[in-house]
Amino acid sequence: STRPSCLPRTWGPAPGPKPTLELGGKAANILFEDAPIDQAIEGVIAGIYFNQGHVCCAGSRLFVQEGIYSTVIKKLRDRIQTLRVGNPLDKNTDIGAINSSAQLQKIRELVQSGVDEGAELTQTQCALPAKGYWFAPSFLTGVTHAHRVASEEIFGPVLSVMTFRTPEEAFERANNIPYGLSAGVWTDKGSKIFKMVNKLRARVVWA
């Protein structure tokens, strides 16, 4: 969706208010040490695994402040093991099928590139249906901005986890991509929320 997003600019200026075009994303969730961690984990899970990650504003990047990194990873690892993959029409299902064979291949290729570049892959241990296009909910740790999974849109149930020390480092790293659709901020400090909202290059910021 990155390439088509350039086309509207060739059509001339749009009349009226500036438009927002939903043409792809690599949304960042930024998790500070003072955030309610359990609540944040649920938000992160919903943000990336809802609809198999087939959402332009899916929170496919997670920046965790270093002081809580180990705690967050443990909770995230435990939580994704409870996700159920299967028939999307079953009310007990959390993750449905990937939309096509081609998209499944793209997800696999990008995840493998992350592993090849040194990231560590964690996936659910649930059994996948034998028929159809399925990918287990996953997250990658040890990710740096040099990794493809940190900057390319995967459009699947895959989360790239990175760390930061300061708010300045967080928004600089979050902004270091060509997308600007959405972002999320997790903290219990209102002043920090407003600071991050003003610094993040994202059209929509949830906090």
List the model feature ranges, each with a label.
Residues 30, 84, 127, 134-207:
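Conserved C-terminal structural/oligomerization subdomain of aldehyde/semialdehyde dehydrogenase
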Residues 2-145, 173, 207:
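ALDH superfamily catalytic-core signature
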